[in-house]
Amino acid sequence: LEQKMLMALGDLHELRTARAEEKSESEEKKAELQNLEGNLTVQKQGQVATKNDRNSLLSITKNEEKKYQQLIKEQEQKEAELEREIADYERQIKVTLNASLLPPRGHGVLAYPLPDTILESCSSLLVADQKNCVTQYFGYTPFAASGAYSGKGHNGMDFRALVGTPVLAAGPGVVEATGDTDAECPRASYGKWILVRHNNNLSTIYGHLSGIDVRIGQSVSSAQRIGLSGRSGYATGPHLHLTVAITQAVQVSSFPANTCGKRRNITLPVVGSDPVSGISGYLNPLNYL
């Protein structure tokens, strides 16, 4: 009997031990489940926070984009108004022009204004070939047709050029003037500019520069570095603007520009025309490059 009681007590002890282990395992699983639920809650909260951050960022980005687009629109309107004022002023410049004094049209009459220049449109080239290519030609380009120049055509050629690219004189001559329209009318017109009078009755204007390396009255040789390209003045991106004009039609004037503020003048090269012959002082650079 004693032996049976000892065996029964042993079985009872094993049963209690098994139940204790089961309870411990159950509690561990319960704790694990609670921990998992906690992790899921944290993950869910994190996802909600991420979503909220994303929505907030998207909202901020949209607001900033809206502000940016509004600034662009205001700047375009300012430039269009200033171009209208410049055009009105240029219409008052009456000069006598003799086309026979101009050099014959031909490739190489003027040197390229940038290193590695190509006269093809950037849009027609592969990205790898888009070095200092043409972003806008002379005359009534699509951009001009959009009203960017208040009904006028583009008075020069635009070349793609990274900020700091050397700008080269298109021929031998003398630096007639330099200036910076940003000092008088920020983010409008040429920005930093150089006017060079050449020896063949042509003059060239270089605009949107980031630096000017020459002084007024200085003689320059063909392909000599005269400045650095940039995006000063009114520019949607870094580029060089090159204007070619008949020397007799070019003058540097300072005149009131309401666009720039009350009682403020803007100083820059302007180009007149011959009312008798109808010849414009602006020339297509492609005829001489």
Model-derived features: where do they sit?
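Extracytoplasmic/periplasmic cell wall- or extracellular glycan-interacting regions that localize
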Residues: 66-198, 202-207, 211-216, 243-289
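Solvent-exposed, polar/charged alpha-helical surfaces in well-ordered, non-transmembrane soluble domains
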Residues: 10, 17, 24, 59, ...
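Short hydrophobic beta/alpha edge segments that flank linear recognition/processing sites
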Residues: 95, 193-194, 221-233, 242
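Amphipathic alpha-helical segments with strong coiled-coil propensity
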Residues: 1-58, 62
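Glycine-rich GHKL/ HATPase_c ATP-binding element in histidine kinases
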Residues: 238
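A generic local structural motif
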Residues: 12, 120-121, 228
